């Protein structure tokens, strides 16, 4: 039995790095929290669509035809990837009518989105993953802080802002620290703030979640 367990653990360690496990755990936790908050008909925002995985999850949660997903990214390739991801995986084509994708910096939001009208805003910071992506194009701490400040004005009661911070690349650790500084200053009577951080893995991703009371 012990030999089988060791063999299984060795196989497990070859397949997954600890950083990868932390990332997958955070993604699962993030989606669980979002799924508990979002209801049919809500407005949600994916502020940095990347490869489209969060946008796909949000689109699936928005059952019915009255909800709305806004998705943004600074790179056209990310918008194209996300649109393709949604078209290939959504069960019905008419769900695309609920989706608005556009190329823009995440630090500002369209004026049509009214204050206190959004149930969830999702961030996946850093650069666009993939072997062919330009790793020099990434989110910047100053833009992210401005974006989060604006996002907090949009979130409705009972809503959630989630920020996945990646600390392993150049500038990532500093960006994560700036995010946590902003969140730590929020009024506890209005907000519940959590940092989900593997304490013994300083370069692993950290998930920051902010709930509007």
Each PLM stretch: what is its role?
Residues 2-43, 47-61, 80-116:
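S-adenosyl-L-methionine
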Residues 42, 67, 159:
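Glycine-centered, small-residue-biased loops immediately flanking beta-strands
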Residues 68-73:
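Conserved SAM-binding motif I beta-strand of class I
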Residues 122-147:
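Mobile active-site "lid"/loop adjacent to the S-adenosyl-L-methionine
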